[in-house]
Design a protein with these regions (language model features):
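Sec-dependent signal peptide cleavage junction
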Residues: 20-36
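Bacterial N-terminal signal peptides that target proteins for export
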Residues: 2-10
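Activation targets extended, charge/polar-rich intrinsically disordered C-terminal tails
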Residues: 29, 45-55, 170-217
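Short, basic/aromatic beta-hairpin or loop at an interaction surface
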Residues: 46-66, 104
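Glycine-rich catalytic cores of cysteine/serine-nucleophile enzymes that process amide/ester linkages
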Residues: 78-139, 160-170
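Mixed-charge, Lys/Arg-rich low-complexity intrinsically disordered regions
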Residues: 60-78
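Bacterial N-terminal signal peptides
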Residues: 12-21
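Active-site nucleophile-His-acid catalytic modules used for acyl/amide transfer and hydrolysis
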Residues: 135-195
Length: 217
């Protein structure tokens, strides 16, 4: 009887694990499909968007709250100030073939959302990316930009948001949605544009009238 009971327990555990695993795989597959469907854009439309980003004039970065800018003040100096938004047109593996975004945390660290969720990464895009845009928002001080970076930092550990049209959730994030959410929630600055419906594409952070470019590569 004991052997039979043990066998039933083991069988139940195995079946339960199998069901959980199957459900997880099914959900992941559906998330992948959602991402591909949402970001299946016309190549010409996509190139026009990045062409608009490349055409943006480059300005000097805003001063710190005390009126002083650390280091060089010339336009097109790679940004290391906390709260500067970074955008690249480079593909991220096969999952996000349409660019990536992050926000500067320190001179050596960014906060970003990758497939594993919100994490910190290396602030070395000037050497590791083929393309890079540094942008900052109109209407905020450098101290407020720092608050936005802190908001993003506080989301570390939250999972990746594969449901790209859902920019309103705060339980999970994709890269450009993370930056969008920080400025929307803190300062009611909407960095989304009319392009790509409700999804927030990384290039929109460059092309929106709410930001201006301080660095390009």
């Amino acid at each position: 009887m004991r052997k039979r009971s043990c066998s039933k327990v083991i069988l139940t555990l195995v079946l339960g694990f199998s069901l959980i695993w199957s459900s997880t795989v099914f959900a992941a597959e559906n998330e992948q499909v959602t991402a591909k469907q949402v970001f299946r854009f016309d190549e010409q439309e996509l190139e026009q968007g990045w062409a608009l980003a490349r055409s943006q004039k480059v300005y000097a970065d805003k001063p710190l709250s005390n009126g002083v800018v650390r280091g060089k003040t010339d336009p097109n100096t790679y940004p290391t100030r906390r709260g500067v938004i970074l955008v690249t047109a480079d593909k991220y593996k096969d999952l996000i073939p349409l660019g990536h975004a992050a926000i500067v945390w320190t001179s050596t660290t960014v906060v970003e959302s990758l497939t594993g969720g919100v994490v910190t990464g290396r602030n070395d895009w000037q050497t590791t990316r083929d393309t890079c845009y540094g942008v900052t928002t109109h209407g905020t001080t450098s101290a407020q930009d720092s608050q936005a970076a802190s908001w993003c930092y506080n989301q570390i550990g939250k999972p990746y948001n594969f449901n790209y049209p859902d920019k309103w959730t705060r339980s999970r994030f994709y890269c450009s949605q993370l930056v969008y959410a920080a400025y929307k929630d803190l300062f009611n600055i909407d960095l989304d544009t009319t392009a790509y419906l409700s999804a927030v594409h990384p290039m929109e952070l460059v092309n929106t009238s709410k930001t201006y470019t301080i660095y390009t590569k």
